[in-house]
Amino acid sequence: RGAIVDIDPFGSPSRYLDCGIRATCHGGLLSVTATDLPVLHGLYQAACQRRYYGIPVRTEYGNEIALRLILGCIHLVAGRLDVKVMPLFAQHNMHYYRVYVKVLVRTDPEDNMGYILHCKSCGHRKTQKEQNHSCEVCGKKIESAGPLWIGEIYDKAFVDSMLPKLENFVVSKSCEKTLLKYQQEIGMPATYFTLDELARKMRSAPISLEKAIEKLQKAGFKAGSTSLNSSGLKTNARIDEVLRFFQN
């Protein structure tokens, strides 16, 4: 078995996960890349369900849903083999999604599978174990993405260990900024708002990301930026609470 195993096919990695997990030693690193973006973004929901055992919802944060669908699929395949996978890191660009997990040859007592619920009427979103049919904010129909991974995507110790090593490599300055954003995301709720999305709902010019974070933190909420979108805002505040604070 290998200490580092890389699955990087053209298209979906799902058919190779069983072999990839079996080929990784206890404590080893498995990296998985997906390039079938139209499927993960919800253009072909039936294909997504066949490949990743879950369906997406088309939203502003579709890239996060895609990463969580991939992690959820890996978790389900690993569970069948009595193996635990622990997400360490994830990255994306215009052409692919890539996740890194630690493989542990033992059963996983934690259940980090669930759904992202998204209301296309008011914009409310949340994660939970079960599906709902109506939005708790506006009462209208709510859509469900999943089942997918609803736990942490980034491991704090893994991300922290990378930062001091940057000086040993020739990398761009944006690399450090991105890693610092990963640090901020640890412990934050899944999904994010975009400033443009909030501005449309308020019918006003977008507020700056720094101001938005500061305002929510002063009000007692968790708030921070995300590596998944340069104008993305992660917070545990509901959409109605966010809009109320920004409109005042």
Give the ranges of each region predicted by the language model.
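SAM-dependent transferase fold signal centered on methyltransferase-like domains
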Residues: 1-248
